[in-house]
Every structure is written in C-alpha cells, then in structure tokens.
Amino acid sequence: PIINLSFGEANNYCKIKCSRGIHTLCKFGTSMKPNCGSKLVKVHGVSNDEKNEIVNRHNQFRQKVAKGLETRGNPGPQPPAKNMNVLVWNDELAKIAQTWANQCSFGHDQCRNTEKYQVGQNVAIASTTGNSYATMSKLIEMWENEVKDFNPKKGTMGDNNFSKVGHYTQMVWGKTKEIGCGSVKYIENNWHTHYLVCNYGPAGNYMDQPIYERK
C-alpha cells in the first residue's frame, strides 16, 4: 500500500535540487492516485511478487554480464565486470517512481533525486490486445535487448548511441546499488497497457564514465 505524503514531507522534496525541473514528489506527491484522464486504470503499484521479479531479473542479468556471458553486442561479446553491485529494493525510489507512473505520461520525469544521491531512470511501455498485461520481465527484457547495439570497444557511455543503449547501460551500471519501481496497468481503446518506471541510485549513464570496471 502506498501512503499519501503529508504536506510537510512533500515540501521537503521541493528543496531537492536537480539540473532541471521541480521534484516529482513536490509536483504530484500529495496524491497517490492515478491521474490518467480517460484511461481506465486497473492496477497501480507493484506487488511483492513483482518487486522480487524486478530485483531478481536485474541481478540475474547484471551477473550474466559481469561473468562475461553476454554474447550480444555491436560487436559482442560484452567484457566481464569486477564492480557489479547486487541491487536491492529501495522504497523511497519506488515511491518517487510510482508517483511519476501515476501520471500516465510516457517518458522521463525531470527531477527525481533523493538527499542520498542522484537518481537514474528507465521507462518501458507495452500494450496487448488480449486480456492480460505484459509482465515485469517482458518489459525489463526490452531494456536488456539494447545490449545488441552496445559497442564495448568504445569504453565510455558518451561514445555509444545513447538513445539506443541507455536503458541497457543503466541496468548494468556497476556503481548503482538500489532500485525502486512504479507501475500502472490500464485499458484504453481495448488495449491492455502496462507502463513501468524504474528509478536507480546512485544514477548511471554518466557520459564520460565506463559503464562498469572491467575484469
């Protein structure tokens, strides 16, 4: 269950500085209800099972890359890593992510940092014509698949085509330690749509840095 922020708590987030924009919890945080216009929201929030699925899926993929078992790339394979942290769930990151997901506006919010660190973000959306929604794993797999366009010979983030690989690189950013996600499932024009927002701390995707230290 997600608890509405008190006015004071939301106000604290208004003091957090980002490179641009007002903090998502300052803007929208006093209501945890979806704000989706004509979209029929069926579920908002992440269940415990889904939370475990998200964390496990991330860590399995991070370990696969860290061990040098990811053969895809442009060119592949991806080199093994020596500093791949094991991600743990963070409720504060999740609360910020859920608040943004609740706006049903596909894309990135402008300001999501915490007092502890700068926060990165991945977003995914998928629609099906059936009566079910794409699973968390299915959405996360879309981020993993971007590895096919990543060139490990260009060591830093900035040398790669960010728009094609940015979700992958945040997923396997070695120094990132925590993750928290928000989710909205809704129906619009008979399409069952699942919108996922994941926040990561400390953030990855610094242009001048390697995505992880190589073995």
Swiss-Prot record:
First-listed, main subcellular location of the protein, grouped into a coarse class:
secreted
Q: Which InterPro entries does the record associate with it? A: Allrgn_V5/Tpx1_CS, CAP_dom, CAP_sf, CRISP-related, V5_allergen-like
One GO CC term, this protein: extracellular region
Q: Where is the SCP domain?
A: 55-200
Keyword terms, alphabetized: Allergen, Disulfide bond, Secreted, Signal
Disulfide pairs here are: C14-C26, C18-C111, C36-C104, C181-C198
Tissue expression as described in the entry: Expressed by the venom gland.
One matching Pfam family is CAP
Under the heading PROSITE patterns, the entry gives: CRISP_1, CRISP_2
What subcellular compartments does it reside in?
Answer: Secreted
Q: Where is the signal peptide?
A: 1-10
Family recorded in the similarity comment: Belongs to the CRISP family. Venom allergen 5-like subfamily.
* Name by which UniProt lists this protein: Venom allergen 5.02
